[in-house]
Amino acid sequence: MSVKEHTKKIMKVFDKNMYYVEMGQGNTILFLHGNPTSSYLWRNIMPYMKEKGRCIAPDLIGMGDSDKLENKSAGTYTFIEHRKWLDELLNLLDIGNRVILVVHDWGSALGFDWAKRNQDRVAGIAYMEGIVRPLKNWDEWPSSSAPIFQGFRSEAGEKLVMEKNIFVEKVLPGSVLRGLTEEEMEVYRRPFNIPEDRRPTLDWPNQIPIEGHPKDVTEITKSYSEY
């Protein structure tokens, strides 16, 4: 299992640089990461798939090596904001039709939503730990992690994430059965070494559609869950 990073390409999207890994040719196989990861998540999978198609794995805006947004306040990196930047990147990359999506975590929500809006362009979807529908209440969330995710929606959560970087330092390695090496952890830490750059990792859990909030994400996830 390799810990080596693949060389990334750069695309100017609106006024920012977004980074992505690309290898292979043919119909697009689109890899979308979640929180708090990056295209690095797919480093050991894409080499096996590059003979099957054009593999593309972007770093979402504000994550991985992609540029950060100027606004550092809460609620900057919403689902809708991520969708805007991802849509434009995919348009610029001309990903074509017969797209296969390989998606994880919030990448699944972005991927499902894109698929719902581009149904005639989708050849297949493979998803892991996906956000497949809105949740009625916290009882539907895994009990082992519900308290901390509820805590992210408080002042204490702001401190835990923005000051202590808990999503990278604790939540991420705690969700990987084999554990992560120090070299792997350094790759995931790098985009969030500066406290103010950690905003995406806190905004994402606050976008989880529970009890009807946020309203727009609840409506979007409900719509694609019926797709």
Predicted features and spans:
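Conserved residues at beta->alpha junctions
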Residues: 33-36, 192
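The serine-hydrolase catalytic nucleophile loop
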Residues: 35-46
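A short, Lys/Arg-enriched amphipathic alpha-helix followed by its capping loop at the start of a domain
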Residues: 44-53, 92
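N-terminal cap/lid subdomain of alpha/beta-hydrolase-fold enzymes
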Residues: 47, 58-61
